[in-house]
A protein has these predicted regions:
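N-terminal chloroplast transit peptides
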Residues: 1-2
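Acidic, glycine-rich flexible loop segments
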Residues: 119-141
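C-terminal segment of classical bacterial N-terminal signal peptides
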Residues: 7-20
Length: 187
């Protein structure tokens, strides 16, 4: 109905909310972060049979938010779970806190970030949600099999960035790369 479409369009203009994923990509930009203040973690769900992506950020030096030990895979101790981390740490645990971005395109509605345990590794995959003909991409790996809180290391070409609106940085992270893997100029 034309009246409903007009109302939705007017509401979008009034609120400034984007109407499509492509529009969303052009409304927001991406700003660099100090990646040494972040750790990407395969965090167990329930009894630990499956895992999800958590990203922890150290915002101040008041006390440590996480500790990393070992290698291949490294184990993460989420210290922030043991104190009120307000103003000290940030924790990003789902699509409200992070999404996939490639170049100028925010792919948060078209890809989900999923932790998958293989026989020899723990991988963070970008999996298409709407178009199964789109590629699944390996974004990060642990470097070996493991259970519990396992550190994920970004693959070459990927990095963390913060969502930006105009000159204002927002509390949303991008798992970012300049171009699609395998495309000309991509790492």
């Amino acid at each position: 109905n034309a009246a409903v479409a007009s109302a939705v369009f007017a509401s979008a203009l009034a609120t400034g909310l984007p109407q499509t994923a492509n529009a969303q990509g052009s409304v927001f930009t991406a700003a660099d972060v100090d990646e040494s203040q972040f750790v990407m973690v395969s965090a167990p769900i329930g009894k630990g049979e499956s895992s999800q992506l958590n990203i922890y950020e150290q915002r101040s030096s008041a006390r440590p938010c996480f500790a990393v030990s070992g290698a291949s895979p490294a184990v993460v101790d989420p210290l922030l779970a043991s104190f009120d981390f307000t103003g000290i740490c940030n924790r990003y645990i789902d699509g409200n806190g992070y999404s996939l971005r490639i170049g100028g395109d925010d792919l948060g509605t078209r890809y989900r970030l999923s932790v998958v345990k293989t026989g020899s590794d723990v991988e963070l995959l970008a999996v298409p949600t709407r178009d199964p003909s789109r590629p699944t991409m390996v974004v990060a790996r642990s470097g070996g099999p493991g259970n519990g809180f396992i550190k994920l290391n970004l693959e070459p070409g990927w990095k963390l960035m913060r969502r930006q609106y105009g000159k204002r940085t927002l509390g949303h992270l991008y798992v970012y790369r300049d171009g699609m893997p395998g495309s000309p100029g991509a790492l």
